[in-house]
């Protein structure tokens, strides 16, 4: 779909807020009370070098062998991480950015980019398709419990997470 225009990304702030809640729980890991049930959460990995980030990205890539490759690079500044055209840019000097939750978020952008289907996506960058891909990715890369918590964090912010990708 050449020339597709990106839809307005109205859910970005709510997605970031939901992921901040989820990431804070992963910083601690361990057992949490989840509406009367006990969930065992992993402690999220923190990365100290670009080669470690790249190795993790490659482990995610191995879960999706039919999609185009993605690489990681250092990004100057410390205000945000970024995904564009098969490249995840991480400000390595910013400790907040060197976390597993950030890499999962940026890799989900790769899955949502449209390049995985050979076309440019016209979906909002943080819309329902992104969220369902992110939840599924977390279930594969981490645990079903972590995925359930992320889905609940999205829903607590009023964000729809579809049952599957259309």
Language model segments and positions:
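Metalloprotease/metallohydrolase-associated module, dominated by Zn2+-dependent proteases
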Residues: 4-98, 116-166
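Active-site recognition of the HExxH zinc-binding catalytic motif
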Residues: 101-114
């Amino acid at each position: 779909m050449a020339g597709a225009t990106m839809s307005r990304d109205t859910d970005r702030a709510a997605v970031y807020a939901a992921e901040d809640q989820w990431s804070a729980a992963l910083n601690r890991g361990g057992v949490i009370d989840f509406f009367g049930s006990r969930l065992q959460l992993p402690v999220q990995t923190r990365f100290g070098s670009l080669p470690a980030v790249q190795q993790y990205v490659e482990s995610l890539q191995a879960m999706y062998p039919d999609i185009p490759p993605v690489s990681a690079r250092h990004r100057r500044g410390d205000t945000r991480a970024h995904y564009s055209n098969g490249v995840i840019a991480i400000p390595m000097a910013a400790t907040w950015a060197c976390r597993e939750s950030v890499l999962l978020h940026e890799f989900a952008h790769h899955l949502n980019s449209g390049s995985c289907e050979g076309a440019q996506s016209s979906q909002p960058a943080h819309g329902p398709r992104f969220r369902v891909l992110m939840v599924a990715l977390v279930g594969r890369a981490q645990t079903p419990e972590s995925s359930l918590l992320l889905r609940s964090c999205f829903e607590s912010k009023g964000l729809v997470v579809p049952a599957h990708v259309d």
